[in-house]
Curated annotation (Swiss-Prot):
It comes from Methanosarcina acetivorans (strain ATCC 35395 / DSM 2834 / JCM 12185 / C2A). HAMAP family: OGT. Its main location: cytoplasm. This is Methylated-DNA--protein-cysteine methyltransferase. Belongs to the MGMT family. The active site is at residue 126.
Amino acid sequence: MYYAIFESPIGPILLAGDEEGLKYVNFMKGKKKIEVPDSWVENEEFFREASRQLEAYFAGELKSFDVKLAPEGTEFQKSVWNALKEIPYGETRTYGEIAKNIGNPKASRAVGLANNRNPIAIIVPCHRVIGANGKLTGYASGLDIKEFLLKLEGSC
């Protein structure tokens, strides 16, 4: 597994993946030291395209990503993550709407859990999911980052 650190306007982001694709995009919020398994190898070149696209996203120049993804999760989680990728830039959806979109309308809580476990932040836009009341709700990296991303996209 390779990794690199992308310096974003809201702090460092850990990128990790292998030949199958990108497996992790995680905010390093509040972490003084980056800890990765000993078997991981730092390789900025491997993530050049993902970093370029993230840079363009934060500059407001990119609305959808085109990088190979290989998230690890259950089939249900992957179905939720695929549904998240269908939420257009600048728009939001509720957990209930995502549940309906994946054909399981009573699974909004399970959708919330899968959303929280999304290993590929930003690119799989879990930040675009809001509560049924239209309010910002839980975000693994903190509501301040969620609000920043939604404001960047013009949906908050």
